[in-house]
């Protein structure tokens, strides 16, 4: 092999890069373990304190658990800006560790839809003409079953029902007068609406992004999904779904506030500091807790700085100055700083400061008009990037509301100033706002006005002069990005397009931990089985394949981390499947080398020719599988995309390691004169010299397959499927009980409860389904009750109906808060999903499109690659045959087998994976047929095909067995969540292997033979 040195160098560098990427995950876990040890010390110290003796026995466990969690969180917050690994802070390390999906980590996945229908109405100033209303209604109706965005659908509907009325008459409102002129064409008006929609979606995205930052979760994710108006939010580890729903769907509240001067408030802060010291000292239990906090701080300081501090002096200062120990006053060099900022605090201390300032005894010290608010971004005055400014807001109105809200802002944009060319923000207001703004700026010349969104301060510029006319320029040392962010904030105050939750998934941390354990166990077992199988079958060469497999796993995980890919439970299934498929390339190569050795070639020549002859089959097979992975990634979402990502990356790393790593090892051994064994006495002549007439038996297999396909179609037509909630819409809950329960009893109780609620509220078409999920103490409950209503009140109502129906089935009393909370609660709702009907239709439509596109792409690739469309037809027929029988199996055995066989996104992922895997078999066989036709051009087609099928039997069986072994490991040890996926893949492997030999190839032969006979008849 040429360039061995370069390949070896690249492999070493790639391995080093992967180890470097994975090292961040290791360091992160080390720091988290230290946090746990630190938290344990805090728990032990509290157990030995006088305060612990006063805690009721029933509350002691909860109290200690709370201290453990809070201490661990406090430790990690404290080191977030500390360098813990080669110059990287803990925060940076955490950002670079491997991302776990919600199904492994627990948390919440939410898809929000920006309601463009409301935006279009608002831009028309809620036009009430019948034609406009009809066009809106028609566009809304069509949006359910269309991939077009709402504005395109509205444009089409207006052309149908508008009666020739120009859109300029509808949208030429006072506020839109600068953008829509009387002479504007319909196309120009639609273009304006699109720009406003894009702005509204962008503003909603920014509002949501900043709200998410306030949850304090690690590695949150938010992404805008094209121009659909949908925003996907992932919050790993969040444990308060109700709070998330309310905060994400809340209306953006933009306000303008006057401010106090720091010098006006500082004396009151000093008084508050003294009063807090007295309050905390008066309460003995609070004192003990504060002492413990001081000890915790000392422990942490020792661990981080490794130097001794005067613990007693520090403790005394904290007791005497509790507020100033966490809030640094805006006092520098003994002088009170100018401006509205009254102090600085670490992010982890802001909640404590808020709590203290709200205490009645403390609140009474400050002026009645005083309202403290935090900046949304860290202060630039304090290094570290984790310190925020506390600003003194002045409430001048009688009702305590802001003197001016964002509803008066008509536009905000970034422009460049006349002096210096720095970015600045230009803001325009309507007539009402202009008058109020003139009064407000006139009263605060030389002072600062705070721009507040959702209770957080985005900017508080100084007023230079009274501003009249409603147009203002906000200047500062803005970067372009900062100026754009501020402009978006100002525009968000007039957001006419609310965002509502249309899809939601909640996974409790306990279920996530169980999924991790199950996934890791299945991965390790599958990995060991594959390693063992390769050694048993191929001896020394099998050991070399195992080395390549180890490198493959390293490269695969390293690549996943470097790309920031999210590892999900289906993703682990993809990893395990990759292990099985990774050895396929080695099997193809080894079988080729064995053929060359049997032909009498020397070891070195056999290896060279074996690799050369195996390349085309390996590349073609892996490309077809990768193509289905790409289709799956494009049309899938969430965990399905995670599965596709690991599959695609795994295919690439598998090809590289199986071809290059093994070849380097073989060449080195050959160069040193060492022997390499490719078999043992049991496997040496395995399936060699077989003379099976496969094509002669095709009529029998046609009958068998035809019967199975007819049975599948009948089951699909008459029995149908058990659809997952992502295909039907509705809400699904996995509920864990503290005892074993009967599915029939749960079904009866839940159905009765939801039917009663439906009758009481005049809700139609309510369906309820209950299935055992895992053990006898877990049930999966799906309901379509109020599926079309998406408010948080309905979510709470559904959970309450479910709670009332199920609370009698718990041995221990459980409150509704305990039942619905995923906060480390072992029982009650441990996971939930909500899918709106529009999203369900989109998912179902995309699934069907994905399957057909995959088949078309594979047909085209094989037809082009083998230069004959009949070969593509044979391959696609084999795939369709496999898919139909697997789908029929899920239809027929749903409700019969003791595990769920739902047809959902994961099932579609399995079907597409089966298509990608099964075509691999076809490609290897077709490649051998092509080779035999080249070697024996005068032989009959039937003879060449039978010879090719017999010669590839060993490869086909070995690949199928290794892949089956890993899939069985997933099915047995992978847990309930992915068992259905594993079953589908096992069926697909078995049926796909059969179909590639007995269906795809015979179909190709029959069609090719018919064409040849037809040509022969014409030539006569």
What are these regions (language model features)?
Residues 2-4, 425-426, 430-445, 449-450, ...:
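Interfacial segments of transmembrane alpha-helices in multi-pass membrane proteins
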Residues 12-15, 543-564, 575-582, 643-658, ...:
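Small-residue-enriched core segments of transmembrane alpha-helices in multipass membrane transport
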Residues 15-49, 90-102, 113-123, 688-739:
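Transmembrane helices with small-residue packing motifs
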Residues 19, 23, 27-31, 44-462, ...:
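Non-transmembrane, solvent-exposed regions of membrane trafficking/translocation machinery
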Residues 208, 510-530, 549-550, 581, ...:
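Pore- and gate-forming transmembrane helices of large, multi-pass membrane proteins
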Residues 234, 469-473, 481-525, 529, ...:
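Juxtamembrane "pre-transmembrane" interface segments
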């Amino acid at each position: 092999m040429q360039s061995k040195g370069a390949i070896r160098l690249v492999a070493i560098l790639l391995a080093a890069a992967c180890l470097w990427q994975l090292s961040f995950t290791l360091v992160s876990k080390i720091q988290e373990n230290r946090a746990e040890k630190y938290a344990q010390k805090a728990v032990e110290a509290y157990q030995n304190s006088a305060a612990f003796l006063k805690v009721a026995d029933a509350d002691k466990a909860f109290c200690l658990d709370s201290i453990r969690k809070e201490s661990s969180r406090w430790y990690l917050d404290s080191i977030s800006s500390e360098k813990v690994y080669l110059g990287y802070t803990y925060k940076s390390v955490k950002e670079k560790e491997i991302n776990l999906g919600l199904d492994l980590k627990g948390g919440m996945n939410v898809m929000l839809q920006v309601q463009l229908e409301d935006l279009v109405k608002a831009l028309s100033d809620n036009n009430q003409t019948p034609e406009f209303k009809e066009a809106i209604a028609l566009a809304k109706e069509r949006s359910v079953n269309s991939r077009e965005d709402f504005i395109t659908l509205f444009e089409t509907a207006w052309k149908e029902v508008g009666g020739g009325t120009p859109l300029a008459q509808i949208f030429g409102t006072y506020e839109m007068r600068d953008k829509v002129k009387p002479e504007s064409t319909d196309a120009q008006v639609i273009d304006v609406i699109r720009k406003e929609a894009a702005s509204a979606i962008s503003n909603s995205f920014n509002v949501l992004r900043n709200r998410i930052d306030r949850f304090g979760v690690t590695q949150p994710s938010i992404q805008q999904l094209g121009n659909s108006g949908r925003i996907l939010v992932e919050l790993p580890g969040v444990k308060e779904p109700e709070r998330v729903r309310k905060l994400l769907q809340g209306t953006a509240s933009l306000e303008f506030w006057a401010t106090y001067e720091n010098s006006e408030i500082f004396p009151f802060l000093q008084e508050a500091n003294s009063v807090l010291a007295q309050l905390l000292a008066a309460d003995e239990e609070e004192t003990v807790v504060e002492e413990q906090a001081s000890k915790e701080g000392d422990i942490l300081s020792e661990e981080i700085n490794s130097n001794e501090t005067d613990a007693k002096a520090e403790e005394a200062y904290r007791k005497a100055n509790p507020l100033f120990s966490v809030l640094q006053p805006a006092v520098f060099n003994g002088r009170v700083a100018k401006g509205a900022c009254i102090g600085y605090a670490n992010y982890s201390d802001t909640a404590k400061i808020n709590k203290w300032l709200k205490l009645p005894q403390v609140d009474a010290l400050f002026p009645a008009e005083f309202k403290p608010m935090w900046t949304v971004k860290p202060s630039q005055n304090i290094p570290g990037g984790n310190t925020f400014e506390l600003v003194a807001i002045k409430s001048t109105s009688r009702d305590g509301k802001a003197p001016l809200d964002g509803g008066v802002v008509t536009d905000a944009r970034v422009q460049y100033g006349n002096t210096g060319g720095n970015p600045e923000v230009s803001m325009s207001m309507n007539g009402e706002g202009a008058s109020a703004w003139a009064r407000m700026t006139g009263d605060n010349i030389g002072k600062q006005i705070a721009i507040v969104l959702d209770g957080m301060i985005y900017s508080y510029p100084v007023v230079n002069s009274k501003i009249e006319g409603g147009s203002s320029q906000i200047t500062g040392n803005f970067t372009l990005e900062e100026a754009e962010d501020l402009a978006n904030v100002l525009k968000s105050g007039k957001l006419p397009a609310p965002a509502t939750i249309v899809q939601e998934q909640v996974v409790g941390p306990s279920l996530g931990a169980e999924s991790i354990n199950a996934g890791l166990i299945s991965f390790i077992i599958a990995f060991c089985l594959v390693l063992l199988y390769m050694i048993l079958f191929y001896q020394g060469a099998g050991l070399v394949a195992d080395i390549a497999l180890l490198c493959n796993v390293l490269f695969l995980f390293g690549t996943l981390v470097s790309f920031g890919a999210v590892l999900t439970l289906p993703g682990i299934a993809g990893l395990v499947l990759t292990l099985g498929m990774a050895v396929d390339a080695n099997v193809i190569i080894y079988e080729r080398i064995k053929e060359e050795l049997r032909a009498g070639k020397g070891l070195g020549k056999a290896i060279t020719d074996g690799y050369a002859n195996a390349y085309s089959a390996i590349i073609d097979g892996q490309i077809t599988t990768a193509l289905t992975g790409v289709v799956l990634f494009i049309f899938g979402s969430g965990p399905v995309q995670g599965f596709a990502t690991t599959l695609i990356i795994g295919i690439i790393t598998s090809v590289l390691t199986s071809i290059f790593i093994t070849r380097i090892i073989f060449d080195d051994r050959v160069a040193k004169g060492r022997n390499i064994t490719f078999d043992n006495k049991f496997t040496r002549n395995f399936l060699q010299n077989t003379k099976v007439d496969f094509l002669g038996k095709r009529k029998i297999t046609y009958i068998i397959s035809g019967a199975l396909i007819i049975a599948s179609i009948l089951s699909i037509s008459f029995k149908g499927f058990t659809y997952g909630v992502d295909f039907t819409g509705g809400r699904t809950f996995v509920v864990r009980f503290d005892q074993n329960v009967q599915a029939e009893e749960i079904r009866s109780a839940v159905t009765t409860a939801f039917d009663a609620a439906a009758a009481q509220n005049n809700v139609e078409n309510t369906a309820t389904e209950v299935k055992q999920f895992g053990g006898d103490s877990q049930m999966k409950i799906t309901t379509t009750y109020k599926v079309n209503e998406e408010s948080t009140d309905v979510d709470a109502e559904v959970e309450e109906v479910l709670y009332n129906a199920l609370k009698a089935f718990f041995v221990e009393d459980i409150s509704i808060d305990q039942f619905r909370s995923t906060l480390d609660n072992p029982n009650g709702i441990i996971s939930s999903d909500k899918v709106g009907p529009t999203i369900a239709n989109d998912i179902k439509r995309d699934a069907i499109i994905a399957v057909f596109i995959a088949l078309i792409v594979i047909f085209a690739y094989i037809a082009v690659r083998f230069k004959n469309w009949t070969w593509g037809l044979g391959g696609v027929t084999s795939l369709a045959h496999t898919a139909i029988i697997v789908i029929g199996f899920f239809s027929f055995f749903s409700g019969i087998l003791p595990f769920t066989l739902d047809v959902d996104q994961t099932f579609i992922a399995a079907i597409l994976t089966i298509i990608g895997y099964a075509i691999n078999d076809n490609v290897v066989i077709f490649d051998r047929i092509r080779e035999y036709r080249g070697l024996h051009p005068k032989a009959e087609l039937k003879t060449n095909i039978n010879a090719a099928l017999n010669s590839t039997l060993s490869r086909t069986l070995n690949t199928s067995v290794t892949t089956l072994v890993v899939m069985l490991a997933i099915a047995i040890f992978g847990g309930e969540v992915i068992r259905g996926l594993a079953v589908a893949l096992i069926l697909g492997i078995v049926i796909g292997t059969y179909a590639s030999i007995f269906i795809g190839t015979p179909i190709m032969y029959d069609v090719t033979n018919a064409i040849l006979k037809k040509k022969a008849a014409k030539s006569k």
